[in-house]
Design a protein with these regions (language model features):
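Conserved tyrosine-mediated DNA breakage-rejoining catalytic core shared by Y-recombinases
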Residues: 32-75
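Major-groove DNA-contacting interfaces characterized by cationic-aromatic clusters
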Residues: 64, 70-120, 204-206
Length: 209
């Protein structure tokens, strides 16, 4: 997250980190704009949208609401969701190709399994070589799970048990606190103009809980 990258990868880094923070499918991510940003009454910013994949299977058309951690808010304010790199997802110079270059530059080289259908063998390859936008959602869920956030809490996945129902109904404030803990991000509050408020405001709020 804090690694320095060359200028030609800075936009890719911002887009990749923001997509990781939002647990967002690439099709939905490409359509986000500042109109998707909202703020709770107690000052927690979040992104809300109707996921294209799940809206066809849910009768109540529930929006997905994901709180913005501080680093994600900074990217949103800096970019306004306008990423030229998202113009093309595939291709030699597309988003997925640049994600591979970004991960290679940052030395994300942990070995992972990759099945070779031609030879029916399992190969071990560096993670950066198979990086893509799909890795964003996996990264979000893996990190969130480390803070005991069930994967169903972070998106509108099919509900299959009472435990899943509990997690999928987490309030934005609770999910915000859990994600901040998982991603090692500070808790904060903002005003309606997306300005971060002094930390004393948060301290007083927590005292009054």
């Amino acid at each position: 997250m804090v690694a320095d990258v060359p200028d030609n990868l800075k936009e890719t880094k911002d887009a990749f980190l923001l997509q990781c923070a939002l647990d967002c499918r690439i099709g939905d991510f490409m359509k986000l704009s500042m109109s998707n940003v909202a703020v709770t009454d107690d000052g927690i910013p979040y992104v809300q949208y109707l996921p294209k994949k799940t809206m066809k299977t849910q009768n109540d058309r529930r929006e997905k609401k994901t709180p913005l951690m501080l680093f994600a808010l900074e990217i949103v304010k800096r970019s306004g969701f306008k990423f030229g790199v998202l113009r093309y997802a595939s291709g030699k110079s597309g988003y997925n190709a640049k994600i591979k270059k970004l991960l290679e530059h940052c030395k994300i080289d942990r070995l992972v399994n990759l099945y070779d259908e031609a030879t029916s063998t399992m190969n071990r390859v560096p993670l950066h070589s198979v990086g893509s936008s799909k890795l964003c959602r996996k990264t979000h869920i893996d990190i969130a799970n480390k803070a005991q956030v069930n994967m169903y809490a972070t998106g509108l996945h099919e509900v299959g048990s009472s435990a899943v129902e509990h997690y999928s109904m987490l309030e934005i404030r609770d999910l915000f606190m859990l994600l901040c803990a998982a991603f090692n991000q500070p808790r904060y509050r903002i005003d309606k103009q997306l300005n971060v408020l002094p930390s004393e405001n948060l301290a007083m709020e927590e005292i009054n809980l």
